A protein has these predicted regions:
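Short glycine-rich loop/turn motifs
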Residues: 85, 281-282, 374, 715-719
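Hydrophobic alpha-helical and helix-loop surface patches within well-folded domains
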Residues: 186, 217-490, 623, 630, ...
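General secondary-structure propensity
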Residues: 24-33, 322, 730-736
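Short, mixed-charge, low-aromatic patches
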Residues: 110, 196-203, 260-263, 292-299, ...
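Small/polar loops that bind or transfer phosphate-bearing groups
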Residues: 61, 308, 753
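Non-catalytic accessory/interaction domains
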Residues: 2, 129, 154-157, 163, ...
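Charged, low-complexity, helix-prone segments enriched in Lys/Glu/Asp/Gln
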Residues: 14-27, 150-151, 238, 343-347, ...
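Acidic/His-enriched low-complexity segments
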Residues: 1-263, 289, 366-367, 391-397, ...
Length: 891
């Protein structure tokens, strides 16, 4: 029986009935080196109390098999108590001891205990990833965040392996029957939730140092450890990672006025990781994509630093104080997202951190918040499947954006003081929104419920704007602030905004700031609001060539530049602005205009072409390079795209030629050139040159000119681009795959083979995706990403089979793997297929088939329906923009 989807009501009933004291967990990884073994033994003893003796509950365990279950000394009959992913526990006593012996699966999906065999040297690596509910794939437990406990881990594994967990290692004892095996015993953990327990095992490279605090608030020296695969050791810049970690610990301990609450700080960079990182206390895990084998730009380093600080903030927000249920996931993720950027800027001096936040994180939030499945920051999470889908742009980026608005609303010092009180009051416990609001009310001296109602418990994004009213003499008489509230906003409820307006003059092609002043939108739901201005402000606003609303990016709202605001001045002078954040806000506004079919893609691409060689910020340059390609692929008219891609290729190539050797710009632009070559008519020789350098130990003209070494990452990107255009043979791909076996090679090969634009390869890729459940998460993703390249006509025959297979995929795969397939294979028919003259967006095959499936499957799992609804909405937006751009093309 598939009963894995624990409901909120079931969790509440269980936490009202029991409290958990300790888990004693033994995991035996003796057989992990042998790929023939698909499972490993576990033994778990749980001590818990029940406030209603005689009652019953259940414990969670997604298992390979169960050997025995003993409750309070009584052996239970397996066929009577084991029911799918649950084990029924009846006739409970006031104090209970439960012991379960079983076997758990090694994972290939990144959920549970993931096992990886390194193709470059055969070494074995294991790590766990649980959030929100995959700890039960490793050992039996009460899988919900408010049943915290102390964990005692014992891990049996090869003696020469690295083995770690949340707590410090107490002892290591050699197996008397096999001196190549030993058992590691770890100290008891603090009282933590199941989803942040962790195990690491394998032949990892280990770097160590000791953190000696400079902060006033601290708990003394802390051992620091960093892990990675042995084959990545030459690229592992652990000194930088340690420096960021030390800076972060100094910063956050003083900021929160609370010492780091755990005895060690370890960070493992692991393969085939599904997410960016996970805040397991004492043993944080990261994707090994943060080990930069092809060199690192400032933007790359900033991104990793942000993630390190994000996870570190979780040691307080999330680990020390944890949400009661996943409804309040924002209580940790929104705060950590905000603190990650703050830590990158203030503790580690990445000056563009808030620029990246504005252009990347908030763009994610705006996109997510306009979907039909958007939800309040404080979400309604009825069950675990819903929880798994809510690690999204609302919970993370919108939540962090709203916290930034909160800081502007109550002041930074008040916000931080509230956090300090919150940690001390609720340490080692669980909380909800009301607990946080109570503290915020006390510290701020204000009733914050209205603010919470407006920002945390509503969904959708407001659209802000300005209108200038002039008198007959040509002088400004009024400045009107406009606000379009989301359609789903409750009647009578507005949104208070604290923002800034900056005025600019365009002089000799340069935008010069002439003034900036604060504005407050009223809390009432008004669509227009007249601003009281001084005479000087009236003059500045009236004469401005550009009005930048939400200057400094304090509030959360779409600000679409219009001709009245100075759209043309913004496009003409964006590169002349001194402030990277101001430039970023203009690029962000232009991007939203493209998505909303208000700005032609040709205009956006032309702006990128004219400014790409002038942008000094690595963060903004990367966004420009990436978004310009997405704009063409997703929103432009299907005819004429090659011309736009070629224009980008020429612009990137010219900018690369004048970029400083060894600069960030060089690497960003070279990556962009390879990517554009996937769709342009140009770039074949560049990609062949890179492939030769990567796989034949030669260098070519481009390598000689830039000094950038051609490694496997760049090589497989180049081969993937060539494969998409049918400019490389299967034999060439096979030869490259054997040059230097590695994860990069195997995934690059899977992508390139699936990208080849012929019916045979698309059929093989589709079958592999749907039928081969042995694929790892990364291999599946690479195959999907290659499959969707090339002419849409090669995939049309799979539109119907895709929808027919959805329920089966959801039932047979883990939620992570199923989600990859559902999102990745969703059909993306362009507007001119099925949407010719006289036909609407809903007549497009992709949209129509999705609608038919949704109507035919009203009882399908809500998480699956959400994925289909979101994909359908992305399709609708894409088709509307394509039609808009095609209509301009026809004029």
């Amino acid at each position: 029986m598939n009963n894995e989807n624990l409901s909120r009501e079931e969790a509440a009933e269980r936490s009202a009935l029991i409290s958990v004291d300790t888990y004693d967990v033994h995991v035996d990884l003796t057989n992990a080196k042998d790929p023939e073994f698909e499972s490993y033994p576990t033994a778990t003893t749980v001590r818990f109390s029940c406030n209603t003796p005689g009652a019953e509950t259940f414990i969670d365990y997604i298992h390979h098999s169960i050997d025995s279950i003993k409750l309070n000394g009584v052996e239970l009959k397996l066929d009577e108590v084991v029911d799918g992913a649950r084990i029924r526990l009846a006739n409970l006593k006031a104090e209970n001891v439960l012991t379960i012996h079983g076997r758990s699966y090694y994972s290939r999906s990144g959920e549970g205990l993931h096992r990886y065999f390194d193709p470059s040297d055969g070494r074995v690596y294991l790590y766990t990833q649980y959030e929100p509910s995959d700890c039960r794939r490793v050992f039996p437990n009460f899988e919900q965040p408010d049943l915290k406990a102390v964990f005692n881990f014992r891990i049996t594994a090869p003696k020469d392996w690295v083995v770690s967990s949340n707590a410090v290692l107490e002892s290591q004892v050699t197996d008397p029957s096999d001196d190549s095996i030993s058992k590691r015993v770890f100290a008891p953990t603090a009282k933590i939730s199941t989803y942040i327990t962790a195990i690491l095992a394998g032949e990892y490279f280990t770097a160590t140092t000791t953190y000696k605090p400079k902060s006033k608030v601290n708990s003394g020296d802390i051992p620091l450890v960093a892990y990675c695969r042995q084959s990545l050791k030459p690229h592992f810049d652990y000194d930088h990672i340690f420096k960021v970690t030390e800076n972060g610990l100094d910063f956050f301990q003083d900021l929160f006025d609370y010492p780091y609450p755990y005895p060690k700080y370890e960070q493992a960079f692991v393969p085939e990781y599904n997410i960016g990182a996970m805040e397991n206390p004492g043993l944080v895990t990261f994707t090994e994509d943060y080990i930069f084998v092809s060199g690192a730009t400032e933007d790359d380093l900033e991104g990793r630093t942000n993630t390190i600080c994000h996870e570190m903030a979780h040691m307080w927000f999330g680990d020390l104080v944890t949400m009661k249920w996943w409804d309040d996931l924002w209580l940790k993720e929104s705060f950590a997202d905000f603190m990650g950027t703050l830590g990158a800027k203030e503790a580690n001096h990445f000056e563009d951190a808030w620029v990246t936040f504005a252009n990347n994180r908030k763009a994610w939030a705006y996109m997510q918040d306009q979907l039909p499945t958007t939800h309040p920051i404080v979400a309604d999470i009825p069950h675990l499947e819903a929880a798994a889908q809510n690690f999204d742009g609302i919970t993370y980026a919108k939540g962090a954006s709203v916290l930034k608005q909160l800081v502007a609303y109550v002041g930074f010092d008040t916000f931080i003081e509230a956090a300090r009180v919150y940690f001390k009051r609720f340490e080692w416990g669980n909380t909800s929104l009301n607990d946080f609001l109570q503290v915020l009310n006390e510290v701020s001296g204000r009733d914050m419920q209205a603010w919470a109602n407006a920002w945390l418990q509503t969904s959708g994004v407001s659209a802000l704007g300005t209108k200038r009213v002039y008198g007959e003499d040509g002088q400004l008489t009024d400045l009107i602030l406009t606000q379009e509230l989301p359609a789903q906003q409750p009647a009578g409820l507005g949104r208070p905004h604290v923002a800034k307006l900056e005025t600019f003059a365009l002089t000799d092609g340069k935008l010069i700031s002439t003034g900036v002043f604060s504005l407050e939108y009223p809390a009432e739901p008004v669509s227009e609001y007249r601003v009281e201005l001084t005479d000087e402000q009236k003059k500045l606003v009236g004469e401005a060539d550009l009005l930048m609303l939400n200057a400094e990016d304090h509030t959360y709202a779409k600000v679409a530049l219009t001709d009245e605001d100075g759209l043309q001045a913004a496009i003409e002078g964006v590169s002349t602005l001194e402030s990277a954040l101001s430039r970023g806000l203009i690029w962000g506004s232009l991007w939203e205009n493209v998505r909303d079919a208000r700005l032609p893609v040709t205009t956006y691409v032309d702006a990128v072409v004219r400014n790409v060689s002038k942008e000094p910020s690595a963060s903004l340059l990367g966004t420009m390079v990436n978004n310009s390609q997405v704009a063409i692929a997703t929103f432009s008219a299907p005819t004429g795209r090659e011309r736009l891609y070629d224009a980008l290729y020429d612009a990137f190539s010219a900018a690369l030629a004048q970029a400083k050797p060894g600069s960030d710009e060089q690497l960003i632009l070279l990556r962009g050139l390879i990517s554009v070559s996937t769709n342009a008519t140009k770039g074949e020789e560049l990609c062949r040159d890179i492939a030769r350098g990567a796989f034949e130990d030669t260098t070519g003209d481009i390598a000689d000119a830039t000094g950038i070494p051609y490694d496997q990452n760049l090589g497989w990107s180049a081969l993937g681009a060539l494969a998409s255009r049918n400019l490389v043979t299967v034999e060439e791909l096979e030869r490259a795959s054997k040059y230097s076996p590695s994860s990069i090679s195997s995934n690059g090969y899977a992508y390139a083979m699936a990208a080849l634009p012929n019916a045979e390869r698309k059929a093989a890729a589709y079958k592999t995706i749907m039928d081969d459940e042995s694929l790892s998460n990364d291999a599946l993703a690479s195959t999907i990403n290659g499959y969707v390249r090339g002419p849409v006509e090669l995939r049309e025959q799979y539109y119907g089979p895709y929808f027919e297979a959805l329920l089966g995929v959801w039932e047979s795969r883990s939620i992570g793997m199923a989600s990859r397939i559902v999102r990745g294979l969703y059909p993306k028919a362009p507007y001119n297929i099925g949407s010719t003259e006289g036909l609407g967006v809903d007549d497009n095959p992709s949209v129509k088939l999705a609608q038919q499936w949704l109507e035919a499957n009203p009882e399908a799992p809500s998480a699956l329906r959400r994925l289909v609804l979101e994909a359908q909405d992305h399709g609708r937006r894409s088709i509307l923009a394509q039609k808009f751009n095609a209509s301009l093309q026809a004029k």
